[in-house]
Design a protein with these regions (language model features):
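Secretory/exported precursors with cleavable N-terminal leaders
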Residues: 1-223
């Protein structure tokens, strides 16, 4: 049998500054409760914008999905599982699901409430990338000629570190306000969608997934 040397690759990614196609008004950002758990509530700066968004309700995964385009060709997907269904949504999030969502999106007028947050974390890509259709990298079929001169190298572990900051303008942090927000009644025809409990976020472009993470506690930036 042929023996392969194992290679551990650290990958650090700080996503470049990206602006929303339509920014949030900072004057509409106010403090609001975020339910980390049914028993734990923290105050977070909550952005608000009423507009038409790409939207769908995935009944199979028990979640709502809202798409916010950046300037250029990238889109942020915010995924809000029904209460108690986070694990179900996480388990079903793969390349096939993302592709299906983009095909099934419809334009819907929403009054969207989304917390500002900054998250940083590390996770094992060898567990995530196969779900997104990338498998050969962790087998003997991978072409690693650009990384090493050895021919008998196989990736056993890839550690990904990502930083994402989301605010009114896009992926850039800003100071929070000290006021308290009360949800206003939406205008006629607008549906209210409030991200006030743990949710998932993906940033995608035509080439693939740039970022995938879970926002569990915006005030403290936890994955």
């Amino acid at each position: 049998p042929r023996f392969y040397r194992r290679l551990r690759i650290p990958v650090s990614v700080h996503l470049p500054l990206a602006k929303w196609e339509t920014r949030f008004d900072p004057q509409s950002t106010l403090k609001q409760d975020f339910h980390v758990t049914p028993e734990t509530v923290v105050q977070v700066p909550m952005m608000k914008r009423e507009d038409e968004y790409d939207y769908l309700l995935d009944r199979r995964l028990s979640c709502r999905v809202v798409g916010l385009p950046y300037q250029g060709n990238a889109t942020a997907l915010f995924i809000l599982p029904s209460e108690g269904r986070m694990h179900k949504a996480e388990a079903g999030l793969d390349q096939e699901t993302l592709t299906k969502w983009f095909k099934k999106f419809t334009k819907r007028k929403l009054q969207l409430y989304l917390p500002k947050f900054s998250i940083e974390g590390s996770y094992q890509l060898e567990k995530i990338l196969p779900k997104l259709g990338i498998r050969d990298l962790f087998t003997s079929h991978a072409d690693l000629g650009g990384l090493t001169n050895h021919s008998n190298i196989q990736v056993s572990e890839m550690v990904h570190k990502a930083v994402v900051e989301v605010d009114e303008s896009g992926t850039q942090a800003a100071a929070a306000t000290g006021m308290v927000l009360g949800f206003r009644s939406a205008r006629m025809g607008a549906q209210v969608v409030v991200f006030n409990r743990p949710f998932l976020m993906a940033i995608v472009n035509p080439e693939g997934v740039l970022f995938l993470g879970k926002v569990a506690r915006p005030a403290e930036g936890h994955f």
